[in-house]
Amino acid sequence: MTDSPRILIIEARFYSDIADQLVAGAMSALDSAGFEHERLKVPGVFELPAAICMALRSMEFHSSSNPYAGFIAFGCVIRGETDHYDHVCRESSRALMDLATKNAIALGFGILTCEDRAQAESRAAVDGKNKGGEAAEACLRMIEVKRHFRLIER
């Protein structure tokens, strides 16, 4: 085990092909920056905040010598015929923001909220909009902010 910074990538697998593209973009950015990463899979977007909360509790409980420096949450919600889309998008986004602000975590937000599959595919594609890479870059930048305020070792 090394002591290089680690990022936990939590991926909602409901749209597995979209998740794979998001993660590929993130892993490329993290590898380029020299960050180790670990992947954790959850069923859907609604489960992302709980998984991050569990990881935080585990770090407290086990006093890890190499805790996660940051987290990236990936998933996709595509509008359907009911208001389920609105509830999942709103509640998962709110819960992630609450976790980030209450626990001062570096979080890359990589949840795609799309009207249709074509939008999701173009945003997730590494050779397209590469939203996975963007979420990883956001996480890395927030780690720098934490370092600035001495909330994480340099």
Where would I find each of the regions flagged by the language model?
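Proline-centered loop/turn at the N-terminus of a beta-strand
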Residues: 6, 70, 104-108
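Glycine-rich phosphate/diphosphate-binding loop of Rossmann-like nucleotide-binding domains
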Residues: 2-42
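N-terminal beta-loop-helix "entrance" segment that forms/cooperates
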Residues: 39-55
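C-terminal binding/interaction regions
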Residues: 85, 90-154
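Glycine-rich phosphate-binding loop
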Residues: 51-95
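Short, ordered loop/turn segments at secondary-structure junctions
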Residues: 13-14, 42, 76-77, 112-117
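Electropositive phosphate-/nucleotide-binding environments in soluble metabolic enzymes
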Residues: 16, 20, 24, 42-46, ...
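Short, well-ordered secondary-structure micro-motifs
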Residues: 20-21, 49-53, 82-86, 119-123
